[in-house]
Regions:
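A structural signal for short, well-ordered beta-strand elements
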Residues: 16, 123-126
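Residue-level signal for the nucleotide or nucleotide-sugar donor/cofactor binding architecture
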Residues: 33, 99, 125
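Conserved beta-strand scaffold positions in the cores of enzyme catalytic domains, especially
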Residues: 11, 89-91, 145
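Adenosine-nucleotide cofactor-binding segment
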Residues: 1-49, 95
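C-terminal capping/lid region of NAD(P)-dependent oxidoreductase domains
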Residues: 116-123, 131-151
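Glycine-rich phosphate-binding loop and adjacent beta-alpha segment
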Residues: 45-117, 150-151
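Short conserved AdoMet
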Residues: 32, 55, 142
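Well-formed, non-transmembrane alpha-helical positions, independent of function
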Residues: 1-2, 81, 107, 136
Length: 151
C-alpha cells in the first residue's frame, strides 16, 4: 500500500525484521544492486543491515538514531564496513542549516501542493495525549511524523 500511495519503488517494514540477517535479506530483495545513499533516522540493526548492503563509496546522512533513545545505546556491530566499503557517514543537524529554511520550505511546499511529494503523519488529539504520543514515537508506533494537535 505504501509503495503505491507514496510512489516508492519498494518499502520494507524494518519492525517486521527482528535481526540484521532478516533485514539484510529483505534489503537485498528490494535493492538487488546494493545501496548508494541512505538517510539514517533509526540506527540499531537497521543501520547494520544497510551497511551490509552498501556499495563501495556509499553515503550515509545521519539525522537520528531513535532505536537507542529509550534505553541503552545500541552499538554499531559492523564498523569495519565503513572502511572496507569506503563509506562516508556524516551527521546532519537541521538547525545548522537554517539559512536554507525559507527556500526549502517554499520548494517542499510546492512539491506537496502539486502532489509530487507525499507524506504520512500520526496525529494525537489534545495536550493530554502528548506523553502517550511521545512514548509511541520511541516505540515506533507512529506512521511518519508524530504530531500532537493542541486545539
Amino acid at each position: 500500500a505504501v509503495v503505491n500511495e507514496l510512489g516508492f519503488d519498494a518499502c520494507i517494514d524494518y519492525k517486521a525484521h527482528p535481526d540484521v540477517k532478516s533485514l539484510a535479506k529483505a534489503l537485498k530483495e528490494a535493492c538487488p544492486d546494493g545501496i548508494d545513499g541512505y538517510f539514517e533516522n533509526v540506527g540499531g540493526h537497521l543501520l547494520d543491515a544497510v551497511m551490509l548492503r552498501s556499495n563501495a563509496f556509499a553515503r550515509v546522512a545521519m539525522c537520528g538514531m531513535i532505536a537507542g533513545y529509550n534505553g541503552e545505546p545500541i552499538p554499531m556491530t559492523l564498523p569495519q564496513l565503513i572502511l572496507t566499503n569506503r563509506m562516508k557517514i556524516e551527521g546532519f543537524i537541521v538547525s545548522e542549516h537554517m539559512e536554507a529554511w525559507p527556500e526549502a520550505l517554499k520548494e517542499l511546499g510546492t512539491l506537496v501542493a502539486t502532489g509530487k511529494l507525499k507524506y504520512k503523519e500520526s496525529v494525537a488529539q489534545g495536550i493530554a495525549s502528548a506523553p502517550e504520543a511521545f512514548l509511541g514515537l520511541l516505540k515506533g508506533k507512529n506512521h511518519g511524523k508524530q504530531l500532537v494537535k493542541l486545539v
